[in-house]
Amino acid sequence: MNFENLLIELGTEELPPKSLRKLAESFLANFTEELTKADLAFSSAVWYAAPRRLAINVTELALAQADKVVEKRGPAVSSAFDAEGKPTKAAEGWARGNGITVEQAERLVTDKGEWLVHNAKVEGVETKSLIAAMAQRALDKLPIPKPMRWGNNKTQFIRPVHTATMLLGSELIEGELLGIKSARTVRGHRFMGQASFELAHADHYLADLKEKGKVIADYEVRKTLIKADAEKAAAKIGGKADIEDSLLEEVASLVEWPVVLTASFEEKFLNVPSEALVYTMKGDQKYFPVFDEAGKLLPNFIFVTNIESKDPAQIISGNEKVVRPRLADAEFFFNTDKKHTLESRLPSLETVLFQQQLGTLKDKVNRISALAAFIAEQTGANAVDAARAGLLSKTDLMTNMVMEFTDTQGTMGMHYARLDGETEAVAVAMEEQYKPKFSGDTVPSAGVSCAVALADKLDTLVGIFGIGQAPKGAADPFALRRAAIGVLRIIVENKLPLDLVDLIAKAQALHGTNLSNANASDEVLEFLMARFRAWYQDKGIGVDVILAVLARRPTRPADFDSRINAVSHFRSLEASSALAAANKRVSNILAKVEGALPTTINANLLTEAAEQALAAKLNELQPLLAPLFANADYQQALTLLAGLRESVDQFFEDVMVMADDEALKNNRLALLNNLREQFLHVADISLLQ
C-alpha cells in the first residue's frame, strides 16, 4: 500500500487566544477519528496553530482504503433450489444482484443450516476523494459556543475564514472547507515576509511558512522560544521572569513571530504592593514581571511583540507608556485606601447584599467571625485573632484597589491589615481565607487562617443549602463544590481534629431563622461525603476502598483520611483478598439472622478446634487492638487483623455455623459478629473487590 503525508490548513481572522489550543486539539482529534472510521491507516498526526490559522499534519497516510471482502449471505440452500435441484427465482435474483450466477455462489454451513454466500471483494476508495468531507465534519464538531457569519456567506465559524489548503503530498485535494475552495495559497505574516505564497508540498508547510511567510506555525515551538528568550532577557538584568504557563499559553496564541523585549517602569511604583502591579502587568497587558533573587519585584517587565522592528526602542517606549497609567492608578488607589482602616469600612458592608435570604456582607462577616472563633477553640488556634480576622475578612472588597483589580482581594486585605497594625495572624488570614482557589492550590496552614477559611466556606455551604439552592447538574453558581473540597482539604492536610457534624450544626445555628430547608444539615453532610469520594478518586484511590470507608460514615475528615490510607495499605497485603471474601461471607450470614445478633461468646460451647483457635486469636488481639482504635492507628490495626487469615480460613473449612443445636449456632454467630466488629472499627472490608 502507498502512503503520503497530508496537510490541511484553515486561514482565518485572529482566533480567540484562550481557545486556540483547544480548537487545534479538537480539530486533530475529530479528524483522526474520521480517519479511523474510514479505515484509513496513518503513522502519526499533529496539530499546528497560530493566531490566524489552524492546521493538521498526518504522516504516512494510506492513499486508499484497504480492499475488503464482504460476506453477502443469500437464501438458505433449502429454499434456494426446487425439488428438481434447479435454482429458485429467489436464488437467481440474489445471485444476479451480486453479479454472479447461482453456480458461482459458495456455501456457508452454520448451526442453523446451510446458506448460499458470496464473498464479494470491495475495492477501497481513494483517500483524496474522502478528505474534504472528513475535514468538514471535523470542523463542524469543534467546540464553538458562539459561531459567527461574515459577508454574504451562510457558513458559520468562530472567526471569518479566508483560505483553505488540503495537500496530499504534492497533490492539491479538491473540495471546500467552510465554503472556501481548497487552494495552494497560504497567507504569511500580516506585516513581514510574503503576504501569501503557493505551497508546493505538504512537507514544506512549516519551513515555507517560516522562511517565506515569517510565521512559526508550531504552537509548542513558539511557546518554548518565548519562554527561553524571556528567561534570557530577565537574566541579563539580574532577575527572573515570572512565567506562568497560562499566561505563556495566551501570549503564544497572540503572536506568529515572537520577539521578546525588555522594558521598565518608574521605581516609585514599587511602593505599591507588588501583587497589584503584577496583576495589571499580567492580567491587563500580558507582560511577564521580573523579580530579583530574593523574590522582590524589579522595575522591569518583559513583553512579546509580533514583529521584528528596525527600531525596537520605539516599541519598548510605547509599551512603557501604555502600562504607566495603569501603574499610576494602582499607586493612587493604594495611597487613597491607606487613609481609611479596614475596621472603618465595616459599616459599608451593610450596603452590599451577599444573598437576599442570607443577608448582607456585614451579616456574613459576623457569622464568619463567630464560626472562626468556634473552630479556633477546637483546633488550639488563637480564637481572638480568628474572630477579628473573620470580622475584617471582606472589608478589603470595599477598597478602591480591589474594586479596580478584583483578583487582588484578600491579598490587599493582608497589606492593609498590616498597615492598620493588626496582628500578623489576622493579616495572613485575610489573604489565605480564599485558599485553595483552584485544583492544586495550597491550603492555609496557620491556625487562624484555617479557621477563617473554613468558616467562610461552611457559612456559604450551609446557607445556600439552607435556602434550597443546592447545585443541580453542572450548574454551581455559588461554587459550592469547590468550597466543599476546600473544607475537606484544609482539615485533612492540616490534620485538624474537627467533626463535620459539629461544624455544620454551628454554622446552621449562626444563620438563625434565615434557613427554610429543614434538611439542610443532612444535605450538606451528604454533599461533603460525595466530594470526599470524588476527591479520593481523583487521587487514584480505588472506589471499593472509598466505599468501604464510607460505609462507616466517619464524619471527621482527618479520621476519614486515616481510614482510607489504612484500607489502601491493607489491600496491598497478601491476606486482604481472603479476608475481604470472608467478611463478605460473614456479612451475608449475619444478615439472615432474625432479631438481635448474639454477642456473648461462651467458651464452653466452642467444640471444634477451628472455632477454638479463632476465638483464642481474637482474645489475643483485642487488648492490642483497643489502643490502636482509640488512637486512630488504623493501619497497624488492620495489619494485626490480617494475621487472622489462617484462623478464619480454617474456621469456614471445618465449622458449620448454622448448626442444628441452637446454642452452638448462636455461639458461632456471636464469634463471627465479634470478628466482623473488629474490622468495622475501621471500614467494611467486605466491600473490597
Swiss-Prot record:
Question: Short name of one Pfam family for this protein?
Answer: DALR_1
- Listed EC numbers: 6.1.1.14
Q: Where in the cell is it found?
A: Cytoplasm
Q: Which reaction does it catalyse?
A: tRNA(Gly) + glycine + ATP = glycyl-tRNA(Gly) + AMP + diphosphate
Q: Which InterPro entries match?
A: DALR_anticod-bd, Gly-tRNA-synth_bsu, Gly-tRNA-synth_heterodimer
PROSITE patterns (alphabetical): AA_TRNA_LIGASE_II_GLYAB
Mention any one GO cellular component term assigned to this protein in its UniProt record.
cytosol
User: Record's superkingdom?
Assistant: Bacteria
State the similarity comment. Belongs to the class-II aminoacyl-tRNA synthetase family.
Q: Which HAMAP family match?
A: Gly_tRNA_synth_beta (MF_00255)
| Protein name listed in UniProt | Glycine--tRNA ligase beta subunit
Q: Which organism is it from?
A: Shewanella baltica (strain OS185)
Protein's gene = glyS
